[in-house]
Amino acid sequence: MRRAFVERNTNETKISVAIALDKAPLPEESNFIDELITSKHANQKGEQVIQVDTGIGFLDHMYHALAKHAGWSLRLYSRGDLIIDDHHTAEDTAIALGIAFKQAMGNFAGVKRFGHAYCPLDEALSRSVVDLSGRPYAVIDLGLKREKVGELSCEMIPHLLYSFSVAAGITLHVTCLYGSNDHHRAESAFKSLAVAMRAATSLTGSSEVPSTKGVL
């Protein structure tokens, strides 16, 4: 099963994240997170379990959308220094999620590797292209104009996607092509990334690593 559990604790944030890429049961050591979750929105149980509570509602919403449409089960709990601002929480949760994703993927054998998707949300349309390359790189262009969406700074949205790509060791190109509402622009971007990730991580039935180098 492609799954992982990661704890990442610093003086700024304390984070626990569990991921199962194929809706498999989440690692048992993450069960305690269920009792900590206070978010009512990003909390669903069933075949696909998604429980996210970062202390920032819109960030929970984005991680929920990412997991939902990528086909992941996900538990993510964070408490950070929000008394300062949202920077450390947004950045560090993305790092922890990227580490967990990389661990769950293993050596990347037997996956499609590349994925792309367009996703709309009403008037907004976003495109994401993913390469599970082992080489972290991110080009993010969302064109957000507001200072914040909810309690999440708009400047942190591209930064957290960059942080995720670095920790996961993957290449991301995420672009919002157009849209007049920043909530819609951001959410369509996360949904397009999710669908692209789902394609890139899909299994081909081969045992080979999809690279001429033989490793990723």
UniProtKB/Swiss-Prot annotation:
Keywords: Amino-acid biosynthesis, Histidine biosynthesis, Lyase, Phosphoprotein. The modification Phosphoserine is found at S211. InterPro entries: IGPD_sf, ImidazoleglycerolP_deHydtase, ImidazoleglycerP_deHydtase_CS, Ribosomal_Su5_D2-typ_SF. One of its GO terms (cellular component) is nucleus. GO terms for molecular function: imidazoleglycerol-phosphate dehydratase activity. It catalyses: D-erythro-1-(imidazol-4-yl)glycerol 3-phosphate = 3-(imidazol-4-yl)-2-oxopropyl phosphate + H2O. One of its GO terms (biological process) is L-histidine biosynthetic process. It comes from the Eukaryota. The keyword Phosphoprotein applies. Its EC number is 4.2.1.19. Belongs to the imidazoleglycerol-phosphate dehydratase family. This is Imidazoleglycerol-phosphate dehydratase. It comes from Schizosaccharomyces pombe (strain 972 / ATCC 24843) (Fission yeast). The gene is his5.
